[in-house]
Amino acid sequence: MKFELGHCLLNERLMEAGKSAEWLAKELLFKPERFYDFMENKRVMPLKIAISIADSIGCDVRALYELIPSDIEVKGD
C-alpha cells in the first residue's frame, strides 16, 4: 500500500516522551531550528534523521508523521 505523509507529529511525540526540541537538538547534534522546521511542516525529515529521532525518544519511526493511505494504483509493477 502506498502512503502520503500528513502532518509531522514530532511535537506530540516529544511531549509524550517529556522531552523538548532543544534536548533533541543536543542529543543528535543539530540546531533546534531544524526540528522546528519539521514540526511546522516546512521540511520533511530525511529517513536517517527520522530513525535517529525515533530511537532517541523511544517511538516507532512511523509515529513521526500522519500516514494517509493513497488510493492511487501503481501500474506496471
Task: Report residues per predicted region.
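A short, Lys/Arg-rich alpha-helix, primarily the initiator
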Residues: 1-19
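A detector for short, charged/polar N-terminal pre-domain segments
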Residues: 1-5, 36, 72
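Residues in the helix-turn-helix
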Residues: 23, 34, 63
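Short alpha-helical "recognition helix" segments of helix-turn-helix
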Residues: 24-25, 53
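Recognition helix of helix-turn-helix/homeodomain-like DNA-binding domains
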Residues: 29-44
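Short, basic-rich loop-to-helix N-cap that marks the start of a DNA-contacting helix
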Residues: 42-55
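Short, charged recognition helix plus adjacent turn
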Residues: 55, 65-77
